[in-house]
């Protein structure tokens, strides 16, 4: 299944106004296959398919304001209203590789699906957040705002074309 369609299916129910509904908690890991197997065992569910983010030519990813070819392997556990995402950086500069390098494996971000990406970024910047990464995927786009100093978390925003 294509990356964008998978995202849209998982988050279709999470479309909302503002940041009222948490859609995802994401964990950066060093070995996604091993960690996904452990989570599957713990949750009593099948291990999800591991997918890779698309190339820069499709994502147009920017990290800290510069084009980046950073990529990652992803796995998603749909836990009802919230998804657990596992992320293994696989090359190039990114918020994922920076986090893993600086802090080791751990909770990387919380995500919300929003209708107004730019307005929500401005709102988070008004709360002391800094846009660190953004890009696209088939059917939508994402942005990471680092608000750890003021909100205690990196916040991911997801939006989908309708």
Residue spans for each PLM region:
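Core segments of cupin and vicinal oxygen chelate
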Residues: 17-20, 28-80, 119-143, 149
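Acidic/histidine-enriched, glycine/proline-rich intrinsically disordered or flexible terminal extensions
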Residues: 3-4, 154, 158-162
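Histidine- and/or cysteine-centered catalytic micro-motif in compact active-site loops
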Residues: 53, 82, 89-91
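Vicinal oxygen chelate
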Residues: 22-30, 74-83, 99-116
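Zn2+-dependent peptidoglycan hydrolase active-site motif and core
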Residues: 96
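A structural feature that tracks compact, well-ordered secondary-structure segments
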Residues: 25-27, 85-89, 111, 123, ...
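Short acidic N-proximal helix/loop "leader" segments that mark the beginning
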Residues: 2-17
């Amino acid at each position: 299944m294509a990356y964008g369609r998978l995202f849209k299916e998982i988050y279709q129910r999470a479309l909302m106004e503002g940041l009222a509904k948490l859609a995802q908690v994401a964990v950066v890991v060093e070995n996604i296959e091993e960690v996904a197997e452990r989570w599957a065992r713990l949750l009593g569910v099948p291990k999800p398919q591991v997918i890779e983010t698309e190339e820069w030519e499709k994502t147009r990813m920017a990290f800290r304001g510069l084009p980046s070819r950073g990529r990652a392997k992803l796995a998603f556990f749909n836990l009802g209203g919230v998804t657990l995402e596992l992320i293994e950086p696989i090359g190039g500069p990114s918020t994922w590789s920076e986090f893993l390098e600086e802090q080791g494996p751990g909770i990387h971000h919380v995500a919300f699906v929003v209708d107004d990406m730019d307005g929500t970024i401005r709102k988070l910047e008004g709360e002391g957040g800094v846009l660190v990464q953004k890009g696209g995927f088939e059917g939508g786009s994402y942005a990471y705002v680092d608000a750890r100093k003021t909100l205690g978390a990196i916040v991911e925003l997801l939006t989908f074309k309708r």
